[in-house]
């Protein structure tokens, strides 16, 4: 199987968590695109979706799936999203697609976070994938200096602006042994909107696509 086929297998497995009448939280990225396409086949059974990005919202709407405002709902049973890396404690690096802030908001609201990815994303220690940090534009230089101070090598994502009108710097060279502590530390830097560590709110269920099939792992 190709990597894309593995992504699709994980995404289709997540449809088992979608119940009749449910509002579904939808993430962003290539794996989630497969989930959205699968969701289209059962769109008559759901009440709609909450999207973590404009790109996912457009894909949902193209399939005729209603996209709802998060502020207009009181309960979000499930959120389905991918990860750039996920460790054994279900802490993740996310934000390769630049939607980390909205992803983190929707994940915080959801009762259950289903992470869908292929086996290459499972790691022993986070940090090989550069950590995205969303920053207010006027704070870019200051935030970059602070990131260097803690041992990172920040690189501006050239030509990219988030759905919120901000910049992304990707931080290389971090071996993240304490993801919860680092998530908090980075978010305390003035000018940082949020960072791509999903540790304080990690995944509840991991659907990990391997050549032998999709493994279902549940957080302790």
Curated annotation (Swiss-Prot):
GO biological process: D-ribose metabolic process; pentose-phosphate shunt, non-oxidative branch
Keyword terms, alphabetized: Isomerase
SUPFAM superfamilies: D-ribose-5-phosphate isomerase (RpiA), lid domain, NagB/RpiA/CoA transferase-like
Any coiled-coil regions, as ranges: none
CDD domains listed in its UniProt record: RPI_A
Pathway: Carbohydrate degradation; pentose phosphate pathway; D-ribose 5-phosphate from D-ribulose 5-phosphate (non-oxidative stage): step 1/1
Keyword Ubl conjugation assigned: no
Entry's Gene Ontology cellular component terms: cytosol
Active site per UniProt: 103
Superkingdom of origin: Bacteria
Catalysed reaction equations from the record: aldehydo-D-ribose 5-phosphate = D-ribulose 5-phosphate
Segments traversing the membrane: none
The keyword Isomerase is annotated on this UniProt entry: yes
EC assignment: 5.3.1.6
Quaternary structure note: Homodimer.
Reported function: Catalyzes the reversible conversion of ribose-5-phosphate to ribulose 5-phosphate.
HAMAP family noted in UniProt: Rib_5P_isom_A
UniProt name for this protein: Ribose-5-phosphate isomerase A
Source organism: Aromatoleum aromaticum (strain DSM 19018 / LMG 30748 / EbN1)
């Amino acid at each position: 199987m190709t990597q894309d086929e593995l992504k699709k297998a994980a995404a289709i497995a997540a449809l088992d968590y979608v119940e009749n009448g449910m509002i579904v939280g939808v993430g962003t990225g290539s794996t989630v695109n497969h989930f959205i396409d699968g969701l289209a086949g059962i769109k008559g059974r759901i009440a709609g979706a909450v999207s973590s990005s404009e790109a996912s919202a457009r894909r949902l709407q193209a399939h005729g799936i209603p996209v709802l405002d998060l502020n207009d709902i009181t309960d979000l049973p499930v959120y389905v999203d991918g990860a750039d890396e996920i460790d054994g404690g279900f802490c993740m690096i996310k934000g390769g697609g630049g939607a980390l802030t909205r992803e983190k908001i929707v994940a915080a609201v959801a009762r259950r976070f289903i992470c869908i990815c292929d086996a290459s994303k499972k790691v022993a220690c986070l940090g090989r994938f550069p950590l995205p940090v969303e920053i207010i534009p006027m704070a870019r230089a200051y935030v970059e200096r602070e990131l260097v101070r803690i041992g990172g090598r920040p690189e501006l994502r050239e030509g990219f602006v988030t759905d919120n009108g901000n910049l992304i710097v990707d931080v290389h060279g971090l071996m993240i042994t304490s993801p919860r502590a680092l998530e908090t530390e980075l978010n305390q830097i003035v000018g940082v909107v949020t960072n791509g560590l999903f540790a304080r709110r990690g995944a509840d269920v991991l659907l990990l696509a391997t050549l032998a099939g999709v493994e279902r792992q549940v957080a302790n």
